[in-house]
From Swiss-Prot:
GO cellular component: centrosome; cytoplasm; kinetochore
Protein name per UniProt: Biorientation of chromosomes in cell division protein 1
Function: Required for proper chromosome biorientation through the detection or correction of syntelic attachments in mitotic spindles.
Region (Disordered): 1-22, 137-169
Pfam families to which the protein is assigned, alphabetical: COMPASS-Shg1
UniProt organism field: Xenopus laevis
Length: 169
C-alpha cells in the first residue's frame, strides 16, 4: 500500500516537492505525510502495534468482548438446523453479518482501545513520536542550511590538438 512520499531513501525526502518540511504549518497534510512515512520507515508503528497486542488479551474489555462474541455465535448456531446440504460459506457469511450488525464489535473495540491504547498514548507513544519528529525536522533543517560545497577544480576542456605547422623552406 504505497502512500505519497513512500519509496524515498535516506535522509532527504519530499512530498509534493516540499524541500523544507520545517517551513510547513503544523497540521499541514504534506508535513503529516512526511512524518508518518518517517515513523513507518523507523518501524515505530510496528512497535506500537506489538506493544498493544502484548497487552490486549489481559484486559477485561477484550475478555468481555470475546465472551460476548462466543455466546452470540453459539446462540446463532443453535438456531440453525444442520443438514448435509447446508452451504458453510453462506452460513459463515450470515453469521459474520449478524455479528457486525449487532454493534457489539464496535462498542467492544472502543472499550479495548480505552483500556489498551489510551493509557500508552501520552506516556509511551507521544514522547516517541515527538522525538522522531524533532530528529527528522532537525535533520532536514541541517540539510537545508548546510553551506554549498565549494566548486571543484574546473573540468579540462577538450581541445583539438594544434595542427602541425607546415613550413616551406
Amino acid at each position: 500500500m504505497a502512500e505519497s512520499g513512500s519509496g524515498t531513501s535516506g535522509g532527504s525526502s519530499s512530498v509534493g516537492g516540499v524541500s523544507n518540511p520545517a517551513s510547513l504549518a503544523p497540521g499541514d497534510s504534506q508535513l503529516i505525510a512526511l512524518i508518518v512515512e518517517q515513523l513507518k520507515s523507523r518501524g515505530q508503528f510496528d512497535g506500537f502495534r506489538r506493544d498493544c497486542l502484548a497487552d490486549v488479551d489481559t484486559k477485561p474489555a477484550y475478555q468481555n468482548l470475546r465472551q460476548k462474541v462466543d455466546n452470540f455465535v453459539s446462540t446463532h448456531l443453535d438456531k440453525q438446523e444442520w443438514n448435509a446440504d447446508m452451504n458453510k460459506n453462506q452460513l459463515r457469511n450470515g453469521l459474520r453479518q449478524s455479528v457486525i450488525q449487532s454493534g457489539m464489535l464496535e462498542a467492544g473495540v472502543d472499550r479495548i482501545i480505552s483500556q489498551v491504547v489510551d493509557p500508552k498514548l501520552n506516556h509511551i507513544f507521544r514522547p516517541q513520536i515527538e522525538k522522531a519528529i524533532h530528529e527528522y525536522l532537525t535533520a532536514q533543517t541541517k540539510e537545508d542550511s548546510a553551506p554549498p560545497l565549494p566548486p571543484g577544480p574546473p573540468e579540462p576542456q577538450e581541445q583539438e590538438p594544434p595542427e602541425p605547422s607546415q613550413s616551406v623552406s
